[in-house]
Amino acid sequence: MKRAGLGLLMLVAALPTFAALKQGDSAPQFKAQASLAGKEFTFSLADALKKGPVVVYFYPSAYTGGCNVQAHEFAVNYDKFAAAGASVVGVSLDNISRLNEFSADPEYCAGKLPVASDAKGDIAKSYDLQVITEYKGQSFLTMKDTRGKEIGHAAAERTTFIVTPDGKVAATIGGVAPKDNVMKALEAVQQLSQKKG
């Protein structure tokens, strides 16, 4: 049953985006409780954009198959994003306690990238993403994560937005495998960096 739940979560997360914001749209500004290396803080998109482009990546849930891969790939490539002048923030419907663990976990975020809590799904919805509560009759609330713990919340679509300092969406990446999502995001910020330079 555990494997079936994880498989369903990965399947739904790989589906194409429903009606996500597109290139040229204004990215909704947000502040959210977040964690970096297990330490809580308030993440502000407006503040992050003052330093350069921001990769805002929505993922279904910490400690699930595809999300673990995606966080790990962002962490191991974090210096490449920084070299292109971009920062990265993950957003999920996980509570902050779960994100404190995930952000510090050396296998996943590895203390390199912040993850923000969107517990009610309001940020995801503002980016025109679906918040999914069940798939084929199985509730995300009762699915188990890779540690055997109940996920306990709904899930946002796996979609990544590249937001430029002027607050516009430069790219929307969805409907691809977690590792490909990260590589496409890196390509997008590197292209932005080349245009700027």
Which functions belong to the PLM regions below?
Residues 18-197:
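Chalcogenol-based redox active-site neighborhoods
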